[in-house]
Regions:
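Membrane-interface aromatic/basic loop that binds lipid-linked glycans or pyrophosphate carriers
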Residues: 1-12, 279-375
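Conserved nucleotide-sugar donor-binding catalytic segment
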Residues: 153-234
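Short beta-strand/loop segment that forms part of the nucleotide-sugar
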Residues: 52-61, 80-84
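Glycine-rich, basic loop-to-helix element that forms the pyrophosphate-binding segment
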Residues: 84-101
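Short, well-formed alpha-helical segments that are part of the catalytic scaffolds
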Residues: 7-12, 33-46
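Conserved donor NDP-sugar-binding/catalytic core segment of glycosyltransferases
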Residues: 118-150
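A conserved acidic beta->alpha catalytic loop
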Residues: 59-68, 86, 110
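Short aromatic/hydrophobic "clamp" motif used to bind/position activated sugar donors
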Residues: 106
Length: 375
């Protein structure tokens, strides 16, 4: 294939011109991807549907060349390439890839992922069978890249941010979904928040669940997350991004008239509860290093929710402790899964008051009272 990297980037044209619209656009953010991109591209070839998909490599200003690894696939897959103006954030790289997408369905893969053979055929068949118009989600495997051993099967788990397929016309374009370019982390969670709001507007609260394993997620350190910060401190270090991608995303969509107030309220209070458990866990594990500014971010978010949604601390607590405290417990479990040990040192209501007092007096429910209500 007599094409060079700069020609592909400059023109945005595919290495192979398809005579019809591809079913899938697979967007792959790349950065110094030479060690892993071969396995990923070969796994796409092994889907045996190369005439029905396009691959978009979106490079985030790599400092190490890897085009020699891509070149052998230029006559096997319809490959497009693009490059960001400067190295900044993962959302910016993904957004650049979306601009070139022409497929009916979008999906995103990290450069060290590997698709399981022929799984995209099953995804396509199931989407068509059930005539899904918006969003589909499948399972994935967490794999040790050194041994190839499966560490866990991510199947109908709390983590719905991965193995998702988005309809380009009915969902992505219709609801004007874009990555938030200034997020250094949690860009996938932000997209999930936007998609959830769009599905709510479309009266389709749940994506189509496809019970198959779609790809292997290689559980290795990356320059963006664990290599630099570790699993635990990563969330603490980028807590502001977490709030931007979750709570703020929902409340902003309510302000734009895209979702009802109750849906935004549910999301906002869920984020506050998770933040409560997160912050207590951080302080318990390492009180000296805990980032004090995270409390400032949380205080700003709580005040924002009160101003936009008309919430009070009493209402937030009552909402969280309602229905046998199932909502409260759900967030506690999610937090424990995310950061490990959860050791609350104060009640949720006291924590809310610590962040921001309501003007009017109210009664504080103690931990023992909460336990009684839970019964």
């Amino acid at each position: 294939m007599d094409l060079d990297q700069q020609e592909l980037i400059k023109t945005g044209e595919p290495s192979i011109e398809l005579n019809h619209r591809p079913y899938f656009s697979i967007i792959i953010p790349c950065y110094n991807s030479g060690a892993t991109i071969t396995n990923l591209l070969q796994s796409i070839v092994d889907q045996h549907m190369s005439d029905d998909l396009e691959v978009i490599l979106s490079d985030d200003h790599s400092t190490k060349p890897y085009f020699d690894k891509v070149e052998p696939f230029l006559d096997k897959l319809s490959i497009k390439m693009t490059e960001t103006e400067y190295n900044f954030a993962p959302g910016n790289t993904r957004e650049a890839g979306v601009k070139l997408a022409e497929g009916e369905w979008l999906c995103f893969a990290d450069h060290d992922d590997e698709f399981i053979p022929d799984t995209l055929k099953r995804i396509k068949a199931t989407i068509n069978k059930y005539e899904e118009k918006y969003c589909a989600v499948a399972n994935f495997l967490e794999v040790d890249p050194d041994t190839g051993k499966t560490l866990s099967e991510m199947k109908r788990t709390r983590n719905w941010n991965h193995a998702k397929f988005y309809n380009l016309d009915n969902l992505w374009k219709k609801y004007d979904i874009h990555f938030k370019k200034d997020l250094l982390t949690h860009e996938d969670i932000y997209i999930s928040s936007r998609v959830n709001c769009a599905l709510k507007d479309a009266n389709n609260d749940n994506p189509l669940y496809i019970d198959c394993f779609c790809y292997k997620w290689m559980s290795r350190p990356t320059t963006v997350s664990r290599e630099k910060y570790g699993d635990y401190s990563f969330l603490e270090s980028f807590f502001k991004d977490y709030l931007e991608s979750t709570g703020y995303a929902y409340v902003e969509q309510y302000q734009k008239g895209n979702i009802p107030i109750q849906y935004a309220t549910d999301a906002a209070i869920g984020v506050l509860l998770l933040s409560y458990f997160y912050s207590e866990s951080f302080i318990f594990n390492d009180p000296v290093k805990y980032k004090r500014e995270n409390f400032d971010y949380l205080r700003d978010f709580l005040i924002y929710c009160k101003e936009v949604l008309g919430l009070t601390n009493d209402y937030i607590w009552g909402y969280a402790a309602s229905n046998g405290a199932e909502f409260y417990e759900k967030q506690r479990v999610s937090a424990r899964q995310a950061v490990g040990i959860v050791m609350p040192s104060r009640t949720f209501m006291q924590w809310l008051d610590y962040l921001h007092h309501d003007i009017r007096p109210r009664h504080t429910m103690s931990d023992s009272m909460w336990k009684e209500q839970k019964k």
